[in-house]
Amino acid sequence: MGFKLYARNYGRSAFCLSGGAGFGYYHLGVIRELLDRRLLPPIITGTSAGALMGAIVCTRTDEELRQVLVPELANKIKFVHDSLIAHIARYATTGAFFDSDQWCRLALWFCRGSLTFKEAYERTGRIFNVTVVPDDPHSPPKLLNYITAPNCVIWSAIMASAAIPGVSSRHVSSMYVCRLTGPVNPSF
């Protein structure tokens, strides 16, 4: 009992996936290699694009990962869908370069739909941590996982983690929770 308490209070090693769309492809290669060597850590932490890549790991079993993490996956991952002119036009009308709806659709696929942190943990045994920055500049960042936000829908946490002013719309920074009975609802 004492060691479990220490591990929870002092923490354990985690595989940290940084943000930045370009890193996403590299993250997947490292994840596949760790999986093949049976060295994939049980704790994954991600921010922005790194959270998107972490979701693919933490919502799937090892066998499912072996089927999904194939070279053809690179064709599914497109962080930029539109021309530069379309991005500039969107920025002029919405204040964001990227289409949040396209990002949501991509995040839904990576997260296997609207799984919550708790559901993903129960399904895979992996602990998935996503860091988000609150709207209040004086508030510290939040760490979301199956302990701190068990009913938070993972795709919404990823969208909030990637919500950078001028890059994506601010409405994506709303996180959603799955009620025990009923639909997914805005929360935080």
Predicted region positions:
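Patatin-like phospholipase
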Residues: M1-I44, C58-F188
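Gly/Ala-rich beta-loop-alpha elbow adjacent to hydrolase catalytic centers
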Residues: T45-G46, G50
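Short glycine-enriched nucleophile-adjacent loop
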Residues: A51-T59
